Amino acid sequence: MYQLSHTGKYPKTALNLRVRQITYQGIGINAYEFVREDGGELEEFTAGAHVDLYFRDGRVRQYSLCNDPAERRRYLIAVLRDDNGRGGSIAIHERVHTQRLVAVGHPRNNFPLIEGAPHQVLLAGGIGITPLKAMVHRLERMGADYTLHYCAKSSAHAAFQEELAPMAAKGRVIMHFDGGNPAKGLDIAALLRRYEPGWQLYYCGPPGFMEACTRACTHWPAEAVHFEYFVGAPVLPDDGVPQDIGSDALALGFQIKIASTGTVLTVPNDKSIAQVLGEHGIEVPTSCQSGLCGTCKVRYLAGDVEHRDYLLSAEARTQFLTTCVSRSKGATLVLDL
């Protein structure tokens, strides 16, 4: 079991924040409020941002900030306990208590809100409400036109209902409960059938929900579609066929060449580019190890990359790769290092 710590391995730039309050938000869901020890202002963040939480064993987990970005004296995250996950959510639920100090990273945003759109469509599945809730707060402050569709198994499984109630009363937030059968819930395909110029779409949730959203918005312009996956979700690579990011069958060995020195290193099928670089003294910052956060992104100069991240746009993939999950379709990749 992984144990959060303020004395373990984490960057020197991490923030030591105190847990001021923990609130129950639904079945298996707790919200955690972090503040500075001196009660001062925290670094500002934008809607859709996340922070890293650091564990004793060096592992890192990302959690979306879900409070109003205008608030400067607290960070709020919500954590769904997953007994079949990698241990992070269990550690937080069982070991993080009020008044404890926790190492928290600075806010980063890979899922930004595009402001100024004539209409914003937000789709949340389960705990995927977290980044979208922050967007709702921002859109409310702007007086922007938006609709949030929040899908959950039941009311008991939906977080932040009391806080979202005023928006629901105005018809801005619409709840959809399917009893555990998505076929009885929101018809995502029907909802996304309509697109108007300038509209922006955002979605976040579990794998099946994400797949349904992705398949339903293929006619939307790429620049109008924004999404954020969780760890363990299936990825749609270049050919559109779902894969498992960690598939050994597809993790073929290849070589990487360091452009600045000409050094050639072999990446075996059981190691990532980031791991091999680290073993040879070439440190590339890493965080999620799952192609979610972009911390380990580097530029490549030559080679045919098999991208397995959830983050990079088609344009970005022509220049960058994520060293934690990307592989090579050919014999060699040349990295701009």
Swiss-Prot record:
Q: What is this protein called?
A: Tert-butanol monooxygenase / tert-amyl alcohol desaturase reductase subunit
Can you tell me which family this protein belongs to? Answer: Belongs to the PDR/VanB family.
The EC number on file is 1.-.-.-
Kindly state which keywords UniProt assigns to this record, in alphabetical order: 2Fe-2S, Electron transport, Flavoprotein, Iron, Iron-sulfur, Metal-binding, Oxidoreductase, Transport
User: Matching Gene3D superfamilies, A to Z?
Assistant: 3.10.20.30, Nucleotide-binding domain of ferredoxin-NADP reductase (FNR) module (3.40.50.80), Translation factors (2.40.30.10)
Residues bound to [2Fe-2S] cluster: C288, C293, C296, C324
Cofactor entry: [2Fe-2S] cluster
Taxonomic classification: Bacteria, Pseudomonadati, Pseudomonadota, Betaproteobacteria, Burkholderiales
Cofactor descriptive note:
Binds 1 2Fe-2S cluster.
Tell me which species this is from: Aquincola tertiaricarbonis
